[in-house]
Amino acid sequence: MPMDKSQKGPGGLTEEERDEILKDIRERFTLKLDHSAICTKNIDELTYVFLRALTGGDIKYRAPDVAGDDPEARSSMKTVAIQLGKEDEAEAAYMAPVEGIDGEVQSQVNHFIEHTGECFQHIALRIEGDSIEEYRELTEKLGVNYITPLLYDDSSNLLQMFTGSLFRSSNPAAGPFIEINQRLDLSEEDRQHFHHETVQGLYSSIEKLQERDEQTWIVDFDKIPEDWDVFEDDTTYDD
């Protein structure tokens, strides 16, 4: 039985109103996999899997201690960025294994593993098409909750933002999250997706979010219509 589209869902929209916004999004934006961060207890093992078993990819970024000499850092992590695909592919996706380094406080990576297990900490989707500001405005109308403002990184020419937790976790501050980003330059001259300042700043931002322990999900799951069934959904968006 089809869902009653006059009822309201996340964002306070009727499902009919939601259809109109979703059609607009599909016409104006494309989302592609940019990278994914994977929390692990052993970065050597996981990196070996990607480099020596699955892809033979290239490491484009290494950080044995993201915090480095930062005197204000209370914890840290190790990470590498592995490019998937050929050397000359500007739009290649990346896998980024991360291993926590505890300090004054537990590393956010180990905090995540404690609550969720070893798995994806966030998946980054890259926007192509119109501006990320317009995408955020439209998705917020649909009920998407973002836990960061729109962040700009001038070293990577990157705009990015993070959603609330992807699942009904008992501890949403632990994640996992979705990152939405827009790379303003994927030219032949600038293909570097990972800069140390970007990674360091992002780690600090997520650590502060976890310390606040705000219970934020990506959408209010309780407001999803009870009669919505993925196997009954017949929504199509004609061009």
Describe the residue ranges of each PLM region.
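Glyoxalase I/VOC metalloenzyme domain signal
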Residues: 1-61, 71-239
